[in-house]
Design a protein with these regions (language model features):
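Periplasmic-binding protein-like
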Residues: 42-44, 117-125, 198-239, 264-283
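Ligand-binding clefts/hinges and TM-proximal coupling segments of bilobed small-molecule sensing domains
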Residues: 73, 152-165, 202-206, 236-284
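Short helix-initiation/N-cap motifs at beta->coil->alpha
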Residues: 75-86, 129, 163-179
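A conserved helix-loop-strand patch within extracytoplasmic ligand-binding domains
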Residues: 72, 101, 114-159
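Extracytoplasmic small-molecule ligand-binding "clamshell" domains
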Residues: 29-100, 108, 257, 261
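A ligand-binding cleft/hinge motif common to bilobed small-molecule-binding domains
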Residues: 83-86, 98-108, 153-156, 181-219
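Extended ligand-binding regions for polar small-molecule ligands
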Residues: 60-69, 128, 135-136, 140-141, ...
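Immediate post-signal peptide segment of exported/extracytoplasmic ligand-binding proteins
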Residues: 27-52, 130, 135-141, 278-289
Length: 289
C-alpha cells in the first residue's frame, strides 16, 4: 500500500473509532429498549409533555437534552401519574418524570436522581396582598387541593379556614371571584399558570418561614426523576448530566420558558432531608444564581 493509501486507511480507521466512541454511552447503558430512554410521564405541564417528537416541559426538556448527550433516543410512555412509579419498579420504563418531589418513602422504592429544581410551598394571592408567612394566613380562608400531604399542617394555623378543591383550576376560580383569600397549590403548576395569565393579577410567594413544626409547608423540596434501583449505572450517567446543567445554569434558561424565574427554584435554602438517607452526609446540593 502506498503512502497516500496508508493515510486514507488511517483516516478512515480513526473516523470509525471516533464514531464508535461517540455512540458508546448508548451501548454501555442498560435500558429497557437498547439505544432508547423510555420515559414515563403524565403530560401535566409545566413538568412534562410531548410535542413535535420531543419531550417538552421543564422536566421533559431536561430529559430530552440528557438523552441526546448519552446517545439515546427518547421513547415516550404517556400514562396516568399513578402508573408511573409502578412502571419504573417493574422495569417497563427507564425513568419517570413529572415534578415529583423527593420523599424518604419514595427513596426506598426507587433510585432518585439529583434535584433538577427546588421548591417551597407558598401562597398564590391577588396583587392586593403580599403574604409570605404562616402568620399572614391566620384567620384567612385558604383553598388547596384534596389529598395534598400538608393539609393537616394547614389546619394547625390559628383561625385558618381550609377549603378543599378537586383541581387547581377550581381553586383559582374561587380566588378570582373573591370567595377565598388565597390558594396553597402545587408550586410549579401555580407559577406556570400565573405566568400565562397576566390578566388574573395573581402572584406566588414562597413561604419565608422555615418552621420545623410545619416541615411540609415550609421545608425545602427537591424535584427529582425516579429510576429502578437495579440500574445504578443509568442513574449515575443521568446525574452526571444533571450536574453539567447546573454548572452551566442551563436549568434557569429552561425554567424561564415555563415561568420558573424566582431564586427559590434554583437556590437551595433550608435543610437537606436527603443527607444520610440516599445521599452521603457531606453531600452538597447544586444551585445556580
Amino acid at each position: 500500500m502506498n503512502k497516500s493509501g496508508i493515510q486514507r486507511f488511517t483516516g478512515l480507521w480513526a473516523g470509525l473509532m471516533l464514531s464508535l466512541l461517540a455512540a458508546a454511552p448508548a451501548f454501555a447503558l442498560d435500558t429497557v429498549e437498547p439505544g432508547s430512554l423510555t420515559i414515563a410521564f403524565s403530560g401535566d405541564m409545566p413538568g412534562t409533555g410531548y410535542q413535535d417528537s420531543k419531550m417538552v416541559g421543564y422536566d421533559g426538556e431536561i430529559l430530552q437534552q440528557i438523552s441526546g448527550k448519552l446517545g439515546l433516543k427518547v421513547k415516550p410512555a404517556l400514562m396516568e401519574w399513578s402508573g408511573t412509579i409502578a412502571s419504573v419498579q417493574a422495569r417497563r420504563v427507564d425513568v419517570m418524570a413529572g415534578t415529583m418531589g423527593w420523599t424518604e418513602q419514595r427513596s426506598k422504592i426507587m433510585a432518585l436522581s439529583d434535584p433538577i429544581h427546588y421548591f417551597k410551598n407558598g401562597i398564590t394571592q391577588t396583587d392586593k396582598t403580599d403574604w409570605k408567612t404562616l402568620k399572614d394566613l391566620q384567620g384567612k380562608k385558604v383553598g388547596t387541593i384534596t389529598g395534598f400531604s400538608f393539609i393537616p399542617e394547614m389546619r394547625k394555623i390559628p383561625g385558618l379556614q381550609v377549603t378543599l378543591y378537586d383541581t387547581s383550576d377550581a381553586a383559582v376560580r374561587d380566588l378570582l371571584a373573591g370567595r377565598i383569600d388565597a390558594v396553597i397549590g402545587d408550586p410549579p403548576v401555580m407559577q406556570y399558570a400565573i405566568s400565562r395569565n397576566a390578566q388574573w393579577h395573581l402572584h406566588f410567594n414562597a413561604f419565608t418561614d422555615n418552621d420545623p413544626d410545619f416541615p411540609l409547608l415550609t421545608g425545602l423540596g427537591q424535584v427529582v426523576f425516579g429510576f429502578n434501583k437495579d440500574n445504578p449505572q443509568l442513574l449515575a450517567a443521568v446525574n452526571e448530566q444533571i450536574q453539567v446543567l447546573w454548572k452551566t445554569c442551563e436549568m434557569r434558561k429552561i425554567g424561564a420558558r415555563y415561568g420558573l424565574t424566582q431564586d427559590v427554584w434554583f437556590m437551595p435554602q433550608g435543610t437537606d432531608l436527603r443527607l444520610s438517607v440516599d445521599r452521603p452526609a457531606d453531600w452538597k446540593l447544586p444551585g445556580c444564581q
